[in-house]
């Protein structure tokens, strides 16, 4: 019987549903149980692996070499490890069984739901027809009653007046006919509904319901079959008696049974086999009794009155020991013949045939035999001694015992001889003179005791210990000496040349010697020949060397002190002190052979030497006393040296420059170079002079000189350097060409004679190392000069006709009146900004509006020469106003950066205020200022013409209108105060125009619309938004009083910002996360492109993420990266325009062409992807979504990386907004577990991409959910190799899937490997 015939009732149907629910619950219970068993098996496998690893940890395994036990144990542990791996494999298979059970449960739920729906459907059809029959029957009864009533009325009227025809009769007749017609129709419908119900009920009972039940029975039986197979797999993987376990156990039994006790030590014996030991020969030394008179004989006991008692006692002890040994032997023999079971070695079994630890009978017999032999040996040894003593005593017999002592004379003589020999031996032991003297000196203490601790006791307390000792013997000249930080204060050790005398201290009066001593170890010396005595003092490493000078050292002659300024320049710029020795050597040469002209001028300073006697023998009990005394001497000598130094030079003497040091050139040759040279000559002279003094004075004076120059610009402007004639402005092209040589000449040369003389002096007097130091000093001077000139607004200097070309210039003294100058400049600039938008009276054109950069700056930046009559210049007024005076050319001021900037020269002119007050047009023409602004895309001169009140273009064509640009992009574009742009936003499904300004932050102002349709902020309304923006821009009035934001610089659209009207959408070719993807065409170039659109309903956060892909792609250019053409943000919808790759998605391409792909093509795809990812890695870009679905293929099978929606331009990215929409099966474990993304995470994804390519589009981790795949990956599971995959490529996949991110290869290595494999494959074919 089946479901079709037995379960047609309603109760049976409900019971079938309940049974299916119970089966589903049972499946859930089974799944949980199998999961728990798999978990337990995994834990057991881990524990068993730990047991095997612990068993294999054998200390000194080489000592067990050749041991069968050790070999068997290792095999046993290896089999345990195999058993653990088998348990782990079975546990993993049980997890797969759980997955199958889960899928079966899901399919069963779907089948249950389908059965319920189908049963309800056919039952509802029958119920509907049943209800229809009932309804038709009630209608039939109703119409029948109406028919009967009207028929009665009609008959009554017709019978009463059959010949009359009237209106009333006609009405009755019509109603009667209608009732009759309704009755007949209802009758027919009722009959049809009954017939249909009969057929439906018959089919429901005989066909539909039995068929449904039969199908349900078939489905359930198929589920039961699958269920049984799943249970069989679970039982199979949980069977401990399986063949694999039996094989493991069999191998364990085999290796244990192979242990043969007789062969255990065979190899060990062969390895350490030696020949039998030779017997030791014990003989009496005859030399012991040669010099002893008496009766002592070798190997013979002496029996006399002195030893007889001891021999008898010894005999008794030995006889007792012999008896004890004999008794023990008797007892042992009795036990062997018949005793206790334990003694006999019988085995006590514990219910089995295996021993519980008691030795076998054979082992017991061996042990007893060994003990018996030992007792017999002891007995024999003691018996030998007994026989020897008895023999000696028997020889004496009953005779009188001989005397053991000689007469008194002999005894006394022996004592004397012994005493003499002992004394002689003692004298010989102390005959070594060197050792005795050293011991005596060490005992008494003194110089050697101090010398032993010289490295510790004779160091200055305030100086650190040297890290490594320096070699005292130096080869070559003094420039090979290395600087050290150890010093001995200001002392130098000298000796008197007349004869030996104690070492004395002398103050170092030479300044350079003092510097050398302060930075070198005292052990460094300069090697000199014996014929030429050294002129430099020898610097000792420790004071111990001072106390122990040799007797043959030459006297030391101190060099004469040199002026302080001759050495300081190099000292300030170099920590190496080789120049000190160089200067000393050169001074020595100068002193020894001076020129005739200089002999009369040279004044030899007096040498003042303080010679202080120091005892050569230090106190024996105090070394600190010596150190305290040395510190005291150092302090005295330091004070004396300070008093002997020359007074410092006057700092104020450098305040003014000499007349012949400052020269100006003619403007026709190089006005810019002349300007910079004249403006910086004073400070440059001071800097070069300043380097010739001490460091402290240098710093103080440089600060003072800078503050002098900063102090008063007003007095500075009154100098002759400013009051010069005016010339016309040279064209910008000539200024740009003269800028480069001017700057080069300014940085390389110098007009200061002091600096030149200093350089020549350094070149003549210093060695190679010192020359580099001098150059460094010169570079420092240049840096100081450039820093000073950067902060000063200088004026243009020309060669006047009424003044001489040689100027007398003096730096003004410190004053604080520069605020008025700044206020004057500010007022001029404000007037210029307010008046510059007025049209010219002659040509009706407007004056030039200066954006962030002038044409002069753009010409320099792009190295383009501006033609004389350019189109851009025709847009502005070039008419010279009447009575215009010559304008001073601008000054190039070198700043901290490489790019120069311009500054107006009219601010400091005496006549500039008067010119502005009298004539507005002259002010406009003379104030062609260029303001320093950001290098971003501010309005260029071509755009400046459009920023006017006469524009008729629509708003979306304005360069400063950015369309529906998100606020985050606005924040990125607006960087400086005054930057502004206009954009559109959608709020509450209503479009609004917003003005965004950077002013103490980023502020956004919604353009208000009046009732008349005009636009305004807080000021007057305007007819168009352009006019409103122009008014705010030219008037420089705040947008709102509260914000105070002023419009200064419009920010243009970037070059990749396209208009939506430039793109024509053709057909939809796909769908992305943010919207549809279309094939489109550009109107301008007729180029086919791909366009990604963003749905208008998405929030701003999603739109920002959508535009992020465009921002990343716009800066990349690589053949394996999809190229960005532009972004359309002028209006909705936002679009990203990219190149169209005709091959489409790589995943679709792999699945469609799975049969035609070759291994060479697949490896080429892998190489293309590696090349693109290598490029991204070099740009610090993390893709985060690398997969076959996000790669494109062109017609030449070349792969391009696409879909940068999740990309980040960082070396390391930490996810902070959750792990939603993360492709789990393509993501590295560290990113899933910790949210940490690096380029090595893309390497993991690249391995999955390779697997997709070689599997020809299969889904990774097929049959596993995301969570299940993640668990398997964490446990070490890796996907198997796809079919026909080269072994090297799969090995590369496994390297990309390394659990440790640092162990994965980088994309550069991956590309090289894949490229090498392709090359090898090509060569093989």
Swiss-Prot record:
Segments forming domain F-BAR: 1-264
Compositional bias ranges of the Polar residues kind: 463-473
Domain SH2 residue range list: 960-1051
UniProt feature, compositional bias: Basic and acidic residues: 659-675
GO cellular component terms attached to this protein's record: adherens junction; extrinsic component of cytoplasmic side of plasma membrane; plasma membrane
Cell compartments where the protein resides: Membrane; Cell junction, Adherens junction
Sites of Phosphotyrosine modification: 1213
Biased composition (Low complexity): 676-685, 749-780
Biased composition (Acidic residues): 907-927
Gene knockout outcome: 53% of mutants die during embryogenesis with the remainder dying during larval and pupal development. In embryos the rate of dorsal closure is reduced and complete closure is delayed until after stage 16. During dorsal closure, filopodia are normal but the actomyosin cable is reduced and the leading edge cells have an irregular morphology. After dorsal closure, a very small percentage of embryos display a small anterior hole in their cuticle. Reduced phosphorylation of arm.
Family, similarity comment: Belongs to the protein kinase superfamily. Tyr protein kinase family. Fes/fps subfamily.
Full protein name: Tyrosine-protein kinase Fer
Organism: Drosophila melanogaster (Fruit fly)
